[in-house]
Amino acid sequence: MTFSVDIFSRFIDNYGDISIPLRLAKGLYIEHGVSSNVFLTINKLSQQILEKNLFNENINIFDIDKMDNNFIPNTNVVTIFDTQLPACYEALLSHKNLLINYEYFSAEQWVDGYHLKESINKKYKKIFYIPGVSENSGAPVFSLNDMGLICNEKRKDKIQINFFCYFNENIDASIKVLNTNFPQIDILQHDRFDKNKNRTNNLLSFNDFDIALSASLINFVRGEDSLIRAILAGSPFIWQPYIQDNNLHIEKLNAFLDHYFTSLPPQLREIFLLWSNQGLNLEHWQYLLGNIENLKYFYLEARDKFIKRGTGIGQIYSLFIK
């Protein structure tokens, strides 16, 4: 079935704001032949991200803040993280339109009761798509054909650790302990910036970032899209959720640890929690590096269970063709 979809997302400070809609558009075309109009916040950083990633003529990129008032909506629409539609666009929607709102990833139990629920909106049909880890939640946006999945095993044995995180003094101190005691390990810090540095200096394309994760011994990742990429890479990872008030991100982290892994060694749970709250000392690095082979099998087992549920690209497409 051939059709097009309109995808909306505002890029604020989270790479998922731009990577998720673009990965969705790419996957819909490659796997199902669906072309997309992707409406994004266009600024200096998003422009540089777009330049790093090549898209064919079946993915059209538009500035969400400069929408043509005469643009005719497609029947199928996706908003990422409940992006507010331009008023001129929303005014043209009717009961013939299906809007899928792709929500934030969560492993919390409430997701099961809200995934695929319809909004009370009377003008057009709106469905809440909530990605998570349970059977009753949605699958996140990813493709089994992503390049990060096809790196060979030799690359995974490279002594390299990736850090894509919300840097702070505790994390800086943790990395210093690692560097001092394990100088043979290459440390890669992604999106490391401050007031005097250009954030775009170390940007990678989506494919190159996926490959970097697959080639790494351990990955420290942040936010949503990078968590999914780390899961697919198959290497051990430590996740740092987006930091929220009242330690709500710790509740989100605990829910993920409880439901994603079949059984979690207490030392590993402690490392996850410390990474989001405090930092790691020599004892924690010794545990991770000293048990790396056992941890690899542990993470691969969890990944294989995770991807058996299907992909968000396939599930969203299925909703469109119902």
Question: Language-model features: where?
Answer:
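Extreme N-terminal starter segment of soluble prokaryotic enzymes
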Residues: 2-6
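C-terminal amphipathic helix plus adjacent low-complexity
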Residues: 262-322
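Nucleotide-sugar donor-binding patch of glycosyltransferase catalytic domains
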Residues: 236-279
